[in-house]
């Protein structure tokens, strides 16, 4: 294991609840009501896929300009919520500190747009990360492998040399398809298992030795 690639929303910080608040308000503005099924389907998705899902769910015309305007509103509203402070997921900050103290390279890999990610980094601490990749900076965001491929490249490693930490179906698929072994932490939506994934109850108490062990189990034959 040469580096660790972190998802942001729901993995490091419990920002998914703030996204849910913003989505409820957006649905009200559009004359509808957010259902649990739609909320579950949007977790980990890109801005574009989210708006398509919302408009399709409400039976609205897929007008690109109107969708873009509502997407901007949603991100601005969420940014204001982010500015109120982002609660840490269990064990996340401690793991970042441990990895930073050991000089393990880290990258942030998120489907969130750059502008909103920068607001989040004000709360999380940008000093932890050598690089960050956002959903609006790649040709295809998660679940495509592009974000994780790009993050590994920026760190100077192959995806197989990096352990990805994710909480969503789309994020785990993105990391796995890029070639990363994946450590999955729980969120509201269950992530299916696979031969290249390991699940933990939370990041609380997880240290470098545990990450190395998981990495070795998921990458047989590779030196960690």
Spans of features found by a protein language model:
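Short helix-capping segments at alpha-helix termini
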Residues: 29-33, 58-62, 102, 124-128, ...
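An amphipathic alpha-helix signature
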Residues: 20, 24, 47-52, 71, ...
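Conserved phosphate-coupling serine/threonine residues in phosphotransfer and NTP-handling enzymes
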Residues: 11, 110-112
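Metal-dependent phosphoesterase signature
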Residues: 33, 55-94
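Catalytic-core regions built around general acid/base machinery
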Residues: 91-104
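Active-site neighborhood of HAD-like aspartate-dependent phosphohydrolases
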Residues: 1-40
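Helix-loop "lid/cap" segments that line or gate small-molecule binding pockets
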Residues: 24-27, 48-62, 120, 152
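Asp-based, Mg2+/Mn2+-dependent phosphohydrolase catalytic module
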Residues: 1-2, 97-100, 113-224
């Amino acid at each position: 294991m040469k580096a660790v690639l972190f998802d942001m929303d729901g993995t490091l910080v419990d920002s998914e609840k703030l996204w849910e608040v913003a989505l409820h308000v957006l649905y009200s503005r559009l004359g509808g009501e957010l259902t649990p099924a739609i909320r579950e389907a949007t977790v980990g998705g890109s801005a574009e896929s989210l708006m398509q899902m919302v408009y399709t769910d409400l039976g609205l015309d897929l007008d690109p300009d109107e969708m873009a305007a509502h997407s901007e509103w949603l991100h601005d509203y969420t940014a204001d919520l982010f500015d109120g402070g982002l609660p840490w997921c269990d064990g996340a900050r401690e793991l970042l500190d441990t990895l930073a103290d050991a000089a393990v390279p880290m990258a942030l890999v998120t489907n969130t747009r750059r502008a909103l990610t920068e607001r989040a980094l004000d709360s999380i601490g940008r000093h932890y990360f050598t690089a960050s990749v956002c959903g609006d900076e790649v040709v295809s965001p998660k679940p495509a492998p592009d974000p994780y491929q790009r993050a590994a490249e920026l760190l100077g490693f192959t995806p197989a040399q990096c352990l990805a930490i994710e909480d969503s179906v789309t994020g785990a698929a993105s990391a796995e398809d890029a070639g990363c072994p994946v450590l999955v932490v729980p969120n509201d939506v269950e992530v299916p298992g696979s031969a290249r994934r390991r699940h933990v109850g939370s990041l609380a108490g997880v240290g470098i030795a545990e990450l190395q062990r998981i990495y070795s189990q998921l990458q047989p034959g590779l030196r960690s």
